[in-house]
Amino acid sequence: MGWPPPSPYEDGPVPTGKQSPFTALDFQLVLLRRMADHNPGPVEDARRRLGVSLADMREANKRWQAMVRSPRSRPALSRYRSVLGEPESRTPRRIGDLDCEAWRWPVPLWPGLRFEVLTAAAGGAVWNEWLVRAPGAEPPALRTVEDLTPWSCTVDEAARAFAPARPLEGSAPTRWGLAFTAPDASGVRREVVAEFTWGLLQRTEVSGPRP
């Protein structure tokens, strides 16, 4: 054997121990991971379309949670920009006496939706983060309980279609709930509790008829 001995890495890159950058694809896996609690079937289909494994999805979620909880974590808005890039749009809004901005990014997995972050107009704190319908995209026709299928609508769309809707506290930070009445296909009004993850409908509990 000659000297020096051949490097064990001469046929490939030397491992550095560094993780690859967290990408927009990874963020979509984070969205799916929480949705898998209620809809494993659609999530599995979506994961296959993205060409990633179950282990990839779990690892992406693990890395995201570590980023969020780290004492050295960057502010939420900066974190989204680092992962998703510059927003597709920044729209001024006024909610009560507060001036804010809605930042929106495209989500390739759901072309008709956008990921929206609501933040103070001067930047800084993030007040809300969820999926909303993309500008110009056709909204769903929500008329009956049967129209409320998984992933069919956003929180805002359900609240408008079946007003007045009562907000409910979610079971996790990325979950929301709505309680409202809606007719079934026979016209009988039912009590409905709808649960959303990242702003997208996941499941409903229907009881009734309303007294």
Regions found by a protein language model. Give the residues of each.
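Eukaryotic proline-rich, low-complexity intrinsically disordered regions
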Residues: 2-14
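A short, surface-exposed helix-loop junction/capping segment
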Residues: 55-62, 133-143
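Short, structured interface segments
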Residues: 117-137
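Mixed-charge, Lys/Arg-rich low-complexity intrinsically disordered regions
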Residues: 144-148
